[in-house]
Amino acid sequence: GRSFVFVIDRSKSMGGQGLNALSAAQKQLDRALAELVETHQFQVIAYHDKPVYFPNRTMAKAVPGNRQRLKEFFGGLAAFGGTNHELAVLAGLRVKPDVLFLLTDGASPELNRVQLDRVRRRSGGLTTIHCIQFGFGPLQEQTSFMQKLAAENGGQFHYVDMRKR
């Protein structure tokens, strides 16, 4: 792919009072961005009940200056509020990326069948969706909405046990 969107949950459960997964998500993002070259484009959407965009609602070039501005953007984020996974994923699909990464603890509310179908239709088979879930201990669910979302959109699911970090 040449264009990437990273959709990162910043709801209360991702913060220091919960999993402290927001900082782990930032590390995952840093690693991913380090792989990009200047011809790649990216966007980051941090969400709770509503999305916040970096740099705005368009793509940014993967140049060092934008990576530095992204660090500043993350520095200003706090984990609070509820979670609207569908709104955030649909916002990420609006810029028609080749690849979308969803990074979340997968907390309720999960995406239901209607919402999963809506995401798949919006993606139109043009965007690969990878899901990275953060949790404590072994993965509890064998068929979470995140596993379905990845499988139905050509992507992969990855689980990060925060106790092993």
Which residue stretches match the model-derived regions?
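Extracytoplasmic/secreted envelope proteins and their assembly/folding machinery
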Residues: 22, 26-33, 67, 71-74, ...
